[in-house]
C-alpha cells in the first residue's frame, strides 16, 4: 500500500503537517499543497496501473514483477520463490499446487504446497493441494434422490411427471415432496 508523503492527520512529529485552518502551529496550509498532492497521487496511480496492465498483458498472471500476482493481489516484491502476491503468487498456488490448470505447467509439490513454474515466477504457497482428493471416489447418486425415479414419479412433479398425478405413497420418495403435495 502506497502512503502519502504528507500527514493528513494534521501533525507530523509536531511540525510540517497539514492544518485544516491554514498555517498555524508550524503546519502547512492545505490549499497550497492540495494541487501538488493530487498531481502526485494521480501520477503514482497512473504509473502503477500502466505497469500492472503491461504485466498482465505481456506476462499473463504474474511475471515481470508486475502481473496479476505482484500488484493485483498482494503487492510488488520478492517472495521465497520469486515475485509474490496472492499467497506467494497466482502461478505458485495454482501452477504448483494443482499442477497448472491455468498454465499447463507442472509444479513441484512440497508436502502439499507448490512452487510455481518459472514463466509465472510464483512464490511459495497460494494453493493447497490435497493429496487424498484424487483417491476419493465419487459417490453415485442415490436413486431415491433422483427426480426422475420411475418408482416415485408423482412425488417429484412437475419435474418429469404429469402434474395432474396424485402424490404417491412410495417409501423411496423424499418426505418433503410427499408433504408438499399431500393435499393435491
From Swiss-Prot:
UniProt keyword annotations, A-Z: Virion
Chief location of this protein within or outside the cell: virion
GO cellular component: virion component
Subcellular location: Virion
Region (Disordered): 130-149
Protein name stated in the entry: Uncharacterized protein L647
Annotated organism of origin: Acanthamoeba polyphaga mimivirus (APMV)
Amino acid at each position: 500500500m502506497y502512503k502519502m508523503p504528507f500527514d493528513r492527520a494534521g501533525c507530523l512529529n509536531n511540525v510540517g503537517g497539514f492544518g485544516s485552518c491554514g498555517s498555524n502551529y508550524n503546519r502547512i496550509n492545505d490549499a497550497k499543497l492540495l494541487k501538488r498532492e493530487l498531481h502526485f497521487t494521480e501520477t503514482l496511480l497512473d504509473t502503477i496501473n500502466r505497469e500492472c496492465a503491461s504485466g498482465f498483458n505481456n506476462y499473463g498472471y504474474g511475471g515481470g514483477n508486475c502481473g496479476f500476482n505482484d500488484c493485483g493481489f498482494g503487492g510488488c516484491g520478492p517472495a521465497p520463490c520469486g515475485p509474490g502476491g496472492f499467497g506467494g503468487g497466482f502461478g505458485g498456488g495454482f501452477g504448483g499446487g494443482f499442477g497448472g490448470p491455468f498454465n499447463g505447467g507442472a509444479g513441484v509439490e512440497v508436502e502439499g504446497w507448490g512452487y510455481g513454474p518459472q514463466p509465472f515466477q510464483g512464490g511459495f504457497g497460494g494453493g493447497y493441494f490435497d493429496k487424498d482428493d484424487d483417491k476419493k471416489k465419487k459417490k453415485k447418486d442415490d436413486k431415491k434422490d433422483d427426480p426422475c425415479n420411475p418408482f416415485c414419479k408423482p412425488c417429484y412433479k412437475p419435474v418429469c411427471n404429469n402434474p395432474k398425478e396424485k402424490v404417491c405413497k412410495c417409501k423411496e420418495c423424499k418426505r418433503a415432496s410427499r408433504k408438499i403435495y399431500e393435499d393435491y
